[in-house]
Amino acid sequence: MDVYEAVTSRRAVRGFTDQPVPREVLERVLTAAAWSPSGSNIQPWNTYVVTGAPLAELKKLAVERVATGVPWDEREYEMYPPAMKSPYRERRSAFGKERYGALGIAREDWEARQRAAIANWDCFGAPAALFVYIDRDLGPAQWADLGMYLQTVMLLLRAEGLHSLSLIHI
């Protein structure tokens, strides 16, 4: 698969099979992704791969915690600006309508929307999860580096015939 096909066929998948991702595929992807650009080549990302029983346990604990309604630690930043401007607000709204509509969930069905949201913490059934972090003392330029790294990882996964989804929090 060439890079154009990888880019245009990449989708944010929210439903995975339980078929394991071979270790050699993950190693190949992460080895190549290490070539991602970063300012002054500091490569600020740290990647942890979790699969198998440890991932199953982590997902189970996360889903149980979310289901209790007990909040996680306070967020260090807002996911979206409180007063998001046009056209971004409309795009986000359209995505929500499309997603919940495809799941047959009405806007006013808060319980069903919450159940659908909990699937985030199960990683939508993915058999592998990559947790990627940067040092919290780094700044916006390193967040951009991280974004380039994540895009590279997702395109390399696509080139391997796999789909992926980036989650901001779990």
Report each predicted region and the residues it spans:
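Glycine/small-residue-rich phosphate/adenosyl-binding loop
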Residues: 49-139
